UniProtKB/Swiss-Prot annotation:
Top-level taxon of origin: Bacteria
Pfam families (alphabetical): GHMP_kinases_C, GHMP_kinases_N
Signal sequence residues: none
Entry-linked HAMAP family: Homoser_kinase
Subcellular location: Cytoplasm
Function: Catalyzes the ATP-dependent phosphorylation of L-homoserine to L-homoserine phosphate.
Organism: Chlorobium phaeovibrioides (strain DSM 265 / 1930)
GO process terms (BP): threonine biosynthetic process
Molecular functions per Gene Ontology: ATP binding; homoserine kinase activity
The entry's keywords: Amino-acid biosynthesis, ATP-binding, Cytoplasm, Kinase, Nucleotide-binding, Threonine biosynthesis, Transferase
Gene3D superfamilies per record: 3.30.230.10, GHMP kinase, C-terminal domain
Name of protein: Homoserine kinase
Enzyme Commission number(s) of this protein: 2.7.1.39
GN (gene name): thrB
Length: 320
């Protein structure tokens, strides 16, 4: 038998103005997946889940309904059909969750990415990281009913990732500015992605579309030129944030606290309830994160929270 341990970190989707087309990875926290392969013949599903920890018993053990095992099944099917690789034997999967569920931190994407990194290593690296993204996206469909890539792609590839097109999938990896730091604060409450998506408008005005496009373009330009002030000015979302902000207790105060502490900009992480802020130094990022935590605690619900300060992860999913 052979075992491989994969790891993938938290990600932030949307990045304010880039709804469903932009995301980035941080260095920690993240999920771990341990895959163990045996050559013995096994009837039934070729992948089984041996254990899940850190989820409070909420995640399914059915390998076809769990994101981490589902993507491994898709991966095995692909390399058998398109790469002509022998996939006999059985794979046992152990999932160690370190990311909170329904948090806006890319929890399902991290599990899928860690599982795919381990599976690819276990089977001799038959796929590129870019190929693995396709399977991770299908995992998002299982997790929340929508096959979006703004968490899945950076979980696999690291950096910032821009999704130019979904059909066909066209991803652009954008390396982060050297001094860009993220403060990520997760209040102790859940907000299901499916519900957070249900409050969004199905149509937007041309005026709002123009503002959103301008900010997306400016944000990408700011990242590519290390123009930190431009990055901050571009973190403006006129589409999703106005609808989702009321779902997060104390959001306005938390955002204001981050900006007053010196952050470049601040917005909702993915569908929430976590909130992220960008800063141009680790010191400012820590100050912004602490200010955000205090604001959550001062909100009507007196929410406690967890906080991480991190540079942007350049590596993506990896083997431990």
């Amino acid at each position: 038998m052979k075992s491989v341990r994969g790891f993938a970190s938290a990600t932030v989707g949307n990045v304010a103005c880039g709804f469903d087309i932009l995301g980035f990875a941080i260095t920690e926290p993240g999920d771990e997946v341990i895959l163990t392969r045996s050559e013995r013949k096994h009837t039934g599903c070729p992948v089984t889940i041996s254990s899940i920890s850190g989820d409070g018993g909420k995640l399914p053990l059915d390998p076809r309904k769990n994101t981490s095992s589902f993507v491994v099944l898709k991966f095995l099917e692909h390399i058998r059909t398109h790469k002509g690789q022998d996939c006999t034997g059985h794979i046992s999967l152990e999932l160690k969750k370190h990311l909170p569920l329904s948090s806006g931190m890319g929890s399902s994407a991290a599990s899928a990415a860690a599982a795919l990194a381990a599976a690819n290593e276990l089977l001799g690296r038959p796929c590129t990281k870019m190929e693995l993204v396709h399977f991770a996206i299908e995992g998002e469909r299982v997790a929340c009913g929508s096959a979006h890539a703004d968490n899945a792609a950076p979980a696999i590839l690291g950096n910032f990732v821009l999704i130019r097109s979904y059909t066909p999938l066209d991803l652009i990896v954008i390396p982060p500015p050297e001094k860009l730091f993220c403060s990520l604060v997760h209040p102790h409450t859940e907000l299901r992605t499916s519900f957070a998506r249900s409050v969004l408008p199905t149509d937007i005005t041309l005026k709002d579309a123009t503002r959103q496009w301008g900010n997306v373009g400016a944000l990408v330009a700011g990242l590519l030129t290390s123009d930190y002030a431009l990055v901050g000015r571009s973190l403006v979302d006129v589409v999703a944030e106005p609808k989702r902000a009321p779902l997060i207790p104390g959001f306005a105060e938390v955002k204001e606290a981050a900006l007053n502490a010196g952050a470049l900009g601040c917005s909702i992480a993915g569908s929430g309830p976590s909130i992220f802020a960008f800063s141009d130094s680790a010191e400012t990022a820590h100050a912004a994160g602490e200010a955000m935590q205090k604001a959550f605690l001062a909100s009507k619900k007196s929410l406690k929270s967890d906080m991480w300060v991190s540079p942007i992860c350049r590596e993506g999913a990896r083997i431990l």
